[in-house]
Swiss-Prot record:
The modification Phosphoserine is found at S331, S366. Homodimer. Interacts with IKBKE and TBK1. Interacts with TICAM1. Interacts with TAX1BP1. Interacts with CALCOCO2. Residues 357-377 are annotated as: Disordered. This is 5-azacytidine-induced protein 2. Residues 40-197 form a coiled coil. Keywords: Coiled coil, Cytoplasm, Phosphoprotein, Ubl conjugation. It is found in: Cytoplasm. One of its GO terms (biological process) is dendritic cell proliferation. Adapter protein which binds TBK1 and IKBKE playing a role in antiviral innate immunity. Activates serine/threonine-protein kinase TBK1 and facilitates its oligomerization. Enhances the phosphorylation of NF-kappa-B p65 subunit RELA by TBK1. Promotes TBK1-induced as well as TNF-alpha or PMA-induced activation of NF-kappa-B. Participates in IFNB promoter activation via TICAM1.
Length: 405
């Protein structure tokens, strides 16, 4: 189209140039024909010129339209490119939204199932708890009724077991007492033999005056008969004290068993409170040591409200008397006949410590060790005879000394 417009312009310009240069020729024809041809040419020229102007206007309008269409085309292409990217993003977002919705529905279903299971389990646990509470109440009532029935009717089996245990203890004590009596009789015969075969008492007194604890072992002159008699006297005194203490302990146990038997026979429908209290009160009066078991009663009060204590005077070193065999045996028989039953307390020797495991446990004399010297044999170490109290003083202290309550 542009080429056509340019051709028209070139034609017009060429005509204008020829018009300037051309010289109006003289028509060869006569006047009318030349005028008519000239007029036809002028009209044709005017017509061509008008059409050329119209074509130029149309050409400019078409150019503007082409430019607008080109701009639209470029915009459409850009829109297509952007729209393709947006569609992909929209598709992705839609797929993600769809997956999220599916997951939400699945989670809702799972939550409903879990809530349903929890409600069922809670219901079952509540039912089990109620049943357990009912069982617990039943067991409590049964236990309370059994306790009431036991308090009203105590079982006889416990009394029988206690009775059997007490009988066994009494039997064991009787056996121990028999063995100790036998040993005491054997020791008595040995003591008589030792007195008959031993040296006279004057030599013993001389030995007591000569021997002193402050002297060394090399200065002591050992005397076989003197050591033997001193050992026999010491063993005699220990056995006598052990026998008297065991006698008192057996009396206390017999008294307690008598109380238990009488209370069990009379009061079968009530709890044995008094007997147990008596047993505990009497058991607190038993002082058990490593070798002896002494019984201690509270002494009767004097008119001024104080308990008497007969403290014997300590023996002086000069109060040394000679006892013959007859006097020693007579003191043994007198003390056996005059065993105090009114609560006399027998003092323990200072060398025996209180090493019992419990306060109310029985502790009998421990058997002699292999390292110790056998009974009746001479000891290598000389005993300080001046520190040993005389027999009449020990007997008096054994019978008359009472502790304060």
């Amino acid at each position: 189209m542009d080429t056509l417009v340019e051709d028209d312009i070139c034609i017009l310009n060429h005509e204008k140039a020829h018009r300037r240069e051309a010289v109006t020729p003289l028509s060869a024809y006569p006047g009318d024909e030349s005028v008519a041809s000239h007029f036809a040419l002028v009209t044709a020229y005017e017509d061509i010129k008008k059409r050329l102007k119209d074509s130029e206007k149309e050409n400019s309008f078409l150019k503007k339209r082409i430019r607008a269409l080109e701009e639209r085309l470029v915009g459409a292409r850009a829109d297509e490119e952007t729209s393709s990217v947006g569609r992909e993003q929209v598709n992705k977002a839609y797929h993600a939204y769809r997956e999220v919705c599916i997951d939400r529905d699945n989670l809702k279903n799972q939550l409903e199932k879990i809530n349903k299971d929890n409600s069922e389990s809670l219901k079952m646990l509540n039912e089990q708890l109620q049943s357990k509470e009912v069982e617990l109440l039943q067991l409590r009532t049964e236990v309370e009724t059994q306790q009431v029935m036991r308090n009203l009717n105590p079982p006889s089996s416990s009394w029988e077991v206690e009775k059997l245990s007490c009988d066994l203890k009494i039997h064991g004590l009787e056996q121990e007492l028999g063995l100790l009596r036998k040993e005491c009789s054997d020791l008595r015969t040995e003591l008589q033999k030792a007195r008959q075969t031993g040296p006279p008492q004057e030599d013993i007194l001389q030995g007591r005056d000569v021997i002193r604890p402050s002297l060394s072992r090399e200065e002591h002159v050992p005397h076989q008969g003197l050591h033997h008699s001193d050992n026999m006297q010491h063993a005699y005194w220990e056995l006598k004290r052990e026998m008297s203490n065991l006698h008192l302990v057996t009396q206390v146990q017999a008294e307690l068993l008598r109380k238990l038997k009488t209370s069990a026979a009379v009061k079968k429908a009530c709890t044995p409170v008094g007997c147990v209290e008596d047993l505990g009160r009497d058991s607190t009066k038993l002082h058990l040591t490593n070798f002896t078991a002494t019984y201690k009663r509270h002494p009767s009060l004097s008119p001024n409200g104080k308990a008497p204590c007969y403290a014997p005077s300590s023996p002086l070193p000069g109060d040394r008397k000679v006892f013959s065999d007859k006097a020693v045996l007579q003191s043994w028989t007198d003390n056996e006949r005059l065993v105090p039953n009114d609560g006399a307390d027998f003092p323990e020797h200072s060398s025996y410590g209180r090493n019992s495991l419990e306060d109310n446990s029985w502790v009998f004399p421990s058997p002699p060790k292999s390292s110790e010297t056998a009974f009746g044999e001479n000891k290598s170490k000389i005993l300080p005879l001046s520190n040993l109290p005389p027999l009449h003083y020990l007997d008096q202290q054994n019978q008359n000394c009472l502790y304060k309550s």
